[in-house]
Amino acid sequence: MIHVTCNQEAFELPEGASAMDLASKMKNSHCFAGALINDQEKDLSTTLKDGDTVLFLTWDDPQGREIFLHTSAHILAQAVLRLWPSAQPTIGPVIDQGFYYDFANLSISEEDFPAIEAMAKAIAEEKLAISRQVFSDKEETLAYFSDNPFKIELITELPEEATISAYKQGEFLDLCRGPHLPSTAPVKAFKLLRTSAAYWRGDPSKESLIRIYGIAFPTTKELKEHLHQLEEAKKRDHRVLGTKLDLFSQQSYSAGMPFFHPRGMVIWNALIDYWKRLHQLAGYQQIQTPQLMSRELWEISGHWENYKENMYTLTVDEEDYAIKPMNCPGCMLYYKTQLHSYREFPLRIAEIGHVHRHELSGALSGLMRVRTFHQDDAHVFLTPEQVEEETLNILNLVSELYGTFGLDYHLELSTRPEQGTIGSDDLWELATEALKNALVKSQKPFIISPGEGAFYGPKIDIHVKDAINRTWQCGTIQLDMFLPERFDLKYTNPQGEKSTPIMLHRALFGSIERFLGILIEHFKGRFPLWLSPEHVRIITVADRHEARAQELAKYFTQQGILATVDQASESVSKKIRNAQNMQVNYMITIGDKELETQLLAVRTRDNRVLNDISVEHFTNTILEELRSLSLTSSL
């Protein structure tokens, strides 16, 4: 017999029992997609060992949902091959909003979707068992996939000692590390969304492919809710709203490099000002490092060897330079300008750095995927014993920042990869436990992604949920044991000896451009007052009211309220509609009555009207709304 733990309860099972055997002892086991066995994602068919700790995953868990969607991608590929046997499947990953699969030798349109969806439904109803198969070596794998050059390329690049697995359902077998659902049966609702052109490995010089996007759910009800969400997302598209609200534009002369307009810069500056205040109070010092630095620096950091294809490089006076794709190396150089003692730690250094990374043109998308952006990085230098407390400090900062925007989030801890890491086992264990303990103390929901950390340390990713329940990966907290060693950073420890510091690299907004895009969609362009590009628009009834309107606008501006006067020769109702379309928070109408009483007629963008408001009361109310960073109107 073996003994395992599940949900802090002990179970006794016969030798050779699987996670599925354990699941049979649980309620609602039909909902289980997979399992975390000793924090490793596994299939339910996995054989358990004595002492294992098991946690079952469902659709409601991010890892369980990914397993479900990955199986759905395989169902898509199987359905396509049943209908077009000559098609060549390439890759089919899970993405934020579902999954896609790329095919070569296939020509279809959305008119073919009903046939594919019907076949996918049939595959699910066949309740095909899904099993994991491990090939004996690369030669066997290459022989099996000999008619698919794309799979051959992927297999050839694998290390000789790699374990190569595939998943089989019915007649279909595909390369995959898994895990997968135990059968196709749980996929009750399956919908294809769109097709697009793609290139093998995203490289325009390689083969053209067709990409089919899809989504799947355990129930039809959830699918209907998701399709409604997609319709709502179209209304919130930041690219459309960015144009309509005159916030930013894109130019063909600089693909992937947005132009911010004056109204967009108001929001930008509000974000930056808030960030600076928050970090000053949290004990951060701000620096600025150059955008252009020599090849020698990037060789020390490792970027020249491992990231050069994503960097913009040039030669000046016969010396190679690169525009920085990341802020970290510049901060390392700043650290070395002074001697440091453990008494200074944690030493918190922040920078809003302007970085450039080459993205393929097909991957560019509004503010979400660009070639130039500003990253709100900070590097915290500390001793190993300080990691847990400082991580908790950062998590508290995360909570305050995202709470200010009304954004909920969850956290993901990525642990040590199986191979290719630096640092001792003891240091990895200490670092991982410190991050995990800080997450527990933060009392925010988090998941563990085993083996998904960087080679130089574990990390915490911050996944933000917007107003229509989409998630976006924004901030990150990365423990780095690599760069301090590469740059030979030192501090004097309590024994008076030189030691290498641990470094926490963290970003809260992540890309500020991307975060702004998320905010545009989250608020649907209806920004809270403190972020709004136009707080007040003053509307005159006739020309004789112009002087009073200008007087008020000047006064409000002096008080720190962004106010404009609509001088257009249009009706009052048209001016009001124009202001509401531009999502101006408050409109003030000046007519004969207001001129006489010196009081205000105020209208909100929600069309609530408040008459006879004194200038003093309105000003004080608006200033308090701005000061408090309120998400709702004060009037």
UniProtKB/Swiss-Prot annotation:
It is found in: Cytoplasm. PROSITE patterns: AA_TRNA_LIGASE_II (PS50862), TGS (PS51880). Its cofactor is Zn(2+). Keywords: Aminoacyl-tRNA synthetase, ATP-binding, Cytoplasm, Ligase, Metal-binding, Nucleotide-binding, Protein biosynthesis, RNA-binding, tRNA-binding, Zinc. GO terms for biological process: threonyl-tRNA aminoacylation. It is an enzyme of class 6 (ligase). Its main location: cytoplasm. It catalyses: tRNA(Thr) + L-threonine + ATP = L-threonyl-tRNA(Thr) + AMP + diphosphate + H(+). InterPro entries: aa-tRNA-synt_IIb (IPR002314), aa-tRNA-synth_II (IPR006195), aa-tRNA-synth_II/BPL/LPL (IPR045864), Anticodon-bd (IPR004154), Anticodon-bd_dom_sf (IPR036621), Beta-grasp_dom_sf (IPR012675), TGS (IPR004095), Thr-tRNA-ligase_IIa (IPR002320). Gene3D superfamilies: 3.10.20.30, 3.30.54.20, Anticodon-binding domain, Bira Bifunctional Protein, Domain 2, Threonyl-trna Synthetase, Chain A, domain 2. The keyword tRNA-binding applies. Zn(2+) binds at residues 328, 379, 505. One of its GO terms (cellular component) is cytoplasm. It holds the Pfam family TGS. Residues 1-58 form the TGS domain. Binds 1 zinc ion per subunit. The keyword Phosphoprotein does not apply. It comes from the Bacteria. Residues 237-528 are annotated as: Catalytic. GO terms for molecular function: ATP binding; metal ion binding; threonine-tRNA ligase activity; tRNA binding. Homodimer. Belongs to the class-II aminoacyl-tRNA synthetase family. This is Threonine--tRNA ligase. It comes from Chlamydia muridarum (strain MoPn / Nigg).
